[in-house]
């Protein structure tokens, strides 16, 4: 009977240690890889051509239409500004002072966005 209890205890300890090790590995890898977006003040730390997300507020009077579907604007985190170049349809919530996340690459000091995401506040207002 005592041998049976000891074997069961050893099995439980091994399972617990394996679960702890697995959870530790998962959490370590998630910590390294989860970055929702970087503010403009942090993008100088990223090398040119690397895919990243930059987020901030669209600066007032910075929206310039270059062509029919090309636009340039500046986002800020109130520390540093970043010029964004984007070609494509703008999100419906895009406007000055709005929070934006741009997905793309940094090239010669300008951020070339391939996708724009407009952030909105948490207050839901149904259409009237």
UniProtKB/Swiss-Prot annotation:
Subcellular location, principal: membrane
Keyword Cell membrane found: yes
Membrane-spanning segments: 9-29
Subcellular location: Cell inner membrane
Record topology, Periplasmic segments: 30-128
Keywords for this protein: Cell inner membrane, Cell membrane, Cytochrome c-type biogenesis, Heme, Iron, Membrane, Metal-binding, Signal-anchor, Transmembrane, Transmembrane helix
Keyword Zinc: no
Domain of life: Bacteria
InterPro entries listed in its UniProt record: CcmE, CcmE-like_sf, NA-bd_OB-fold
Pfam families linked: CcmE
GO cellular component terms, semicolon-separated: plasma membrane
UniProt topological domain (Cytoplasmic) ranges: 1-8
Membrane topology qualifier: Single-pass type II membrane protein
Residues noted as binding heme in the record, renumbered to the chain: 120, 124
Gene Ontology molecular function, alphabetical: heme binding; metal ion binding
GO terms of biological process kind: cytochrome complex assembly
Role according to the record: Heme chaperone required for the biogenesis of c-type cytochromes. Transiently binds heme delivered by CcmC and transfers the heme to apo-cytochromes in a process facilitated by CcmF and CcmH.
Family label: Belongs to the CcmE/CycJ family.
Name recorded for this polypeptide: Cytochrome c-type biogenesis protein CcmE
Species: Rickettsia conorii (strain ATCC VR-613 / Malish 7)
Primary gene name: ccmE
